[in-house]
Amino acid sequence: LAAVSVDCSEYPKPACTIEYRPLCGSDNKTYDNKCNFCNAVVESNGTLTLSHFGKC
């Protein structure tokens, strides 16, 4: 089983679009898109990871 991951190297960003492409974080929270998810990853100092694509 391949690990799912997202490249967050260009984050954090000051503003995210309203694009809806949900991702489920390891905190069992659904993030609206990659930008919102990656900003949360940066804020968590890398402790937050991607559980899977789609809603939790």
From Swiss-Prot:
Lineage: superkingdom: Eukaryota
Annotated compartments: Secreted
Disulfide bonds, paired cysteine numbers: 8-38, 16-35, 24-56
Keywords: Disulfide bond, Glycoprotein, Protease inhibitor, Repeat, Secreted, Serine protease inhibitor
Main location: secreted
PANTHER family linked: OVOMUCOID-LIKE-RELATED, SERINE PEPTIDASE INHIBITOR, KAZAL TYPE 2, TANDEM DUPLICATE 1-RELATED
Identification of the protein by name: Ovomucoid
Source organism of this protein record: Lophura leucomelanos (Kalij pheasant)
